[in-house]
Amino acid sequence: MTIKDYSVSQEDFTLVYDSVLKLYRTTPLPNDLKKYYESEDYISHTDSHRTLFDKLYQWVKSYNLKHKIKLIKQYKKGNIRLLDIGAGTGDFVRSGKEYAHWETMGIEPSEKARTKAKEKGVLLQADFSNLLPHSFDVITMWHVLEHVPDVTQEIQFISNLLKEGGLAVIAVPN
């Protein structure tokens, strides 16, 4: 199946079904993924309120932050050390700290998104360096896994970062 990226690059990509993992993969995988996430049109890396769509997106994001915290609290109680992978502009990291009183940390490869997070007082790391194995109670990936080149490797990595009995919360579209 061929699809077009109407948002950023206008490129055509082919989706190939992986019967082992039961998911579609983009082929060929673009060499420079960074350019897709540094675009002004990549909405999850902005806090824009310019258009009606931007305002609606920010309202939905605000609602979802509360829902995500509530969801995690159903499964984990007490002092929680949480890592948010693909933290965007840091809103979930900040919400977890301010409203749930968790110890939070975020990973975000986009320099632009990390800068926006920093403007809000949220410090995010660019990568996984300095993270110790078995050091998190909860790891979240909100619409991130579908952007990862090697899903199996990512899941194994997350598993290694979780404490025994830890919780991985992974949301993907559809």
Language-model segments: what does each one mean?
Residues 12, 55, 59, 145:
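Charge-dense, low-complexity intrinsically disordered segments
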Residues 67-174:
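Conserved SAM-binding loop
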Residues 1-52:
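N-terminal juxtadomain amphipathic helix
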Residues 36, 40, 59, 63, ...:
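Residues that form generic nucleotide/phosphate-binding pockets
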Residues 10, 64, 133:
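Residue-level marker of regulatory loop/turn positions in helix-turn-helix DNA-binding domains and
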Residues 53-67:
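Conserved SAM-binding loop and adjacent beta-strand
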